[in-house]
Amino acid sequence: MIQMQSLLKVADNTGARTVMCIKVLGGSKRRFAGIGDVIKVAVKDAAPRGRIKRGEVYNAVIVRTAKGIRRADGSLVKFDTNAAVILNNKLEPIGTRIFGPVTRELRTAKFMKIVSLAPEVI
């Protein structure tokens, strides 16, 4: 469960290391975001020679949360950290590699590219 001011790790090779959620997209009163939701993020920490610089604002999709996600069979999938993948304005991933596992809930038409790049789908 991600809200404004939440810090997330970046799970791709764009050069950003840490981002902060500055807005949960999808309605004016929406407070929380989970796996598969799109948020606005500000880059807080970035690699020196990366594609992305500190202070820039991007869209991102959440791929891992410590809160987890409940499946229809009753199982709960949760992770150690919160992580996101940086997106451009067309909601396509900027990076060419994804690090760490992603969940099966991302298998929609919007995020199939992320699922295909991920090393493991849980």
From Swiss-Prot:
It comes from the Bacteria. Pfam families: Ribosomal_L14. GO terms for molecular function: large ribosomal subunit rRNA binding; structural constituent of ribosome. One of its GO terms (biological process) is translation. Keywords: Ribonucleoprotein, Ribosomal protein, RNA-binding, rRNA-binding. Gene3D superfamilies: Ribosomal protein L14. GO terms for cellular component: cytosolic large ribosomal subunit. InterPro entries: Ribosomal_uL14, Ribosomal_uL14_bac-type, Ribosomal_uL14_CS, Ribosomal_uL14_sf. The keyword Transit peptide does not apply. The keyword RNA-binding applies. Binds to 23S rRNA. Forms part of two intersubunit bridges in the 70S ribosome. Part of the 50S ribosomal subunit. Forms a cluster with proteins L3 and L19. In the 70S ribosome, L14 and L19 interact and together make contacts with the 16S rRNA in bridges B5 and B8. HAMAP family: Ribosomal_uL14 (MF_01367). Belongs to the universal ribosomal protein uL14 family. This is Large ribosomal subunit protein uL14. It comes from Nitrosomonas europaea (strain ATCC 19718 / CIP 103999 / KCTC 2705 / NBRC 14298). The lineage of its organism: Bacteria, Pseudomonadati, Pseudomonadota, Betaproteobacteria, Nitrosomonadales. The gene is rplN.
